[in-house]
Amino acid sequence: MSELLSFALFLASVLIYAWKAGRNTWWFAATLTVLGLFVVLNITLFASDYFTGDGINDAVLYTLTNSLTGAGVSKYILPGIGIVLGLTAVFGALGWILRHRRHHPHHFGYSLLALLLALGSVDASPAFRQITELVKSQSRDGDPDFAAYYKEPSKTIPDPKLNLVYIYGESLERTYFDNEAFPDLTPELGALKNEGLDFSHTQQLPGTDYTIAGMVASQCGIPLFAPFEGNASASVSSFFPQNICLGDILKNSGYQNYFVQGANLRFAGKDVFLKSHGFDHLYGSEELKSVVADPHYRNDWGFYDDTVLDEAWKKFEELSRSGQRFSLFTLTVDTHHPDGFISRTCNRKKYDFDGKPNQSFSAVSCSQENIAAFINKIKASPWFKDTVIVVSSDHLAMNNTAWKYLNKQDRNNLFFVIRGDKPQQETLAVKRNTMDNGATVLDILGGDNYLGLGRSSLSGQSMSEIFLNIKEKTLAWKPDIIRLWKFPKEMKEFTIDQQKNMIAFSGSHFRLPLLLRVSDKRVEPLPESEYSAPLRFQLADFAPRDNFVWVDRCYKMAQLWAPELALSTDWCVSQGQLGGQQIVQHVDKTTWQGKTAFKDTVIDMARYKGNVDTLKIVDNDIRYKADSFIFNVAGAPEEVKQFSGISRPESWGRWSNAQLGDEVKIEYKHPLPKKFDLVITAKAYGNNASRPIPVRVGNEEQTLVLGNEVTTTTLHFDNPTDADTLVIVPPEPVSTNEGNILGHSPRKLGIGMVEIKVVEREG
């Protein structure tokens, strides 16, 4: 209803101003601005819903102030360009319509009415209301009834008898199991679901809508609200340190807790969360690569589901034979948006919908087959009678190629339980949410029937039943949940540990690099993660007078305030205000002590603008003073005009990447010397080793041969044509995820460059 009202007000404002208001520059600008805001809000809502399926939520608010990088982002470049072009066209058309009768005399009454209607359209729009609610949730003090509903369970289970296998299916929501909507999509796992306790109405709440958030909700009974963006949790040293979670209770009760997944454990801080709450045995892509049958059989995120579940089965056998009480948690990945991945061992490799193949549905059908095979192995084993198997989605599916079909259904998360000790076959339609999962499992294992805000769906009453407005209630509790982190409110002294790459202050520890906004009553950490903008881009969003402490590699801040450190990859500390004074200190000791020192200076807006503009320079446009191209820092020497075919800086240098260009091209601002030596320090990747690598300058070509280890080679060039471009052609770029950012498409690596130097020869 509010959508129709807001659109009607918008339309009325446009028509009244266009036909009655007449000509007045101020009223035209004001009305166009407000109507334009209405358009931007609704496009933001549309785009947000495209990604989240839940409108403008916490994840979107974070993205609006940072940048979205990570898995599958390239899939959305064209839609993003389309939105920008559409927005430009709408603004142009709106301006033309409003100026329709610009030659008529101005009418104050109609102008005021049009502006009020425009303001009303913004106020009535769902997008404005969602953003308003989110902003309020950032500044509330909390809800006084939080303490009444948040309950800590007993720290142990008396006389535990059952082992636990808990399977998180990535985005594997219950909606996929609707056989009428999606015939024969999940036959194997669907049959197992129907044999157990199937909870059919598990809703998704704010703060539970991505993987680490879903894990926290299901194991701790609280949403993941933090004083920083949730996926940046890899930077913290402990995770809700004061809370009692399911893993803590299991460990205290004599369980050995295991977690197995195909992706890197550091992503989104899963390793920190699990280690903080009772898990001593963790296996991710790094830990599995030395034990799996084929370490090269991987997708963009890590190992495929068939590999991961095979390792989980081996671990289940080993632990069951030992007689030790255990829990085994595993997380799949093949159903990750936007398209998913197909394991090579499954029979269900293709699923057609609407008369054509659908990659996301195909990935679901394949993954559920692998999960079902794993469960059936357990059921066929002699240890099943002592085992409880739980299958749940970590969250609802995000925007994938099946998403528009899912949205036509009543969407719920998956949660079902198969008991080996006491088979039960029942579908329970009780209203519940992800936070109830841990309490329900705890109840089955013989513990309490509550865990944080979660309640057992077998013997308790879910918050989803108690509160009809549970989503709004959850947001109202957000400040209370953030306070559970016990995060410090001041920062006066800090310590940097170079061996551990950590910073400590006021009892808290964070991994480096780190940016902090420091005020009188609050310290806001802004870590760097796969889904966040680089810290310098985040700093560029600070207000002129915001106090900051920025700990990062020296070269990243050198172009602003310490040019002498432009080639240093050591740690540096910068602090101050973007519109005031800044200092840069080189961290020159293994354990380095620092103090915050913010001076109350006059703000210089010209200085502020200059700092912001410099911070926003993209890596490839950065230039530094040097007589050679140093590849382990961002940018290039001042003599270089542009370059291509080169990947991002790493600690040792940079790889060539054929995804960015078949050749490495370095174009200089001026012609290269008539005679020069080209000194190349580099290595080769894979099959490029010991192969001739053409190196060209103008019409002259030399051959470079590299091994897998770094070596230095000098090539002699004559340049009679005054060529200004150096070209290196790796013979056989190899597609690989080695050293890649988690979730990104594979790079095609050829040579790894450490340094390239042009040395002019006499004569």
From Swiss-Prot:
EC number(s) per entry: 2.7.8.20
Gene3D superfamilies on file: Alkaline Phosphatase, subunit A (3.40.720.10)
Any single GO CC term annotated in Swiss-Prot or TrEMBL for this entry: plasma membrane
Primary location class: membrane
Pathway: Glycan metabolism; osmoregulated periplasmic glucan (OPG) biosynthesis
Segments passing through the bilayer: 1-21, 26-46, 77-97, 108-128
Membrane topology per record: Multi-pass membrane protein
Protein keywords: Cell inner membrane, Cell membrane, Membrane, Transferase, Transmembrane, Transmembrane helix
GO BP terms, alphabetized: glucan biosynthetic process
Cellular compartments annotated: Cell inner membrane
Catalytic activity, reaction form: a phosphatidylglycerol + a membrane-derived-oligosaccharide D-glucose = a 1,2-diacyl-sn-glycerol + a membrane-derived-oligosaccharide 6-(glycerophospho)-D-glucose
Any one GO MF annotation of this record: phosphatidylglycerol-membrane-oligosaccharide glycerophosphotransferase activity
HAMAP family noted in UniProt: MdoB_OpgB
Role noted for this protein: Transfers a phosphoglycerol residue from phosphatidylglycerol to the membrane-bound nascent glucan backbones.
Protein family membership: Belongs to the OpgB family.
Protein's name according to its UniProt entry: Phosphoglycerol transferase I
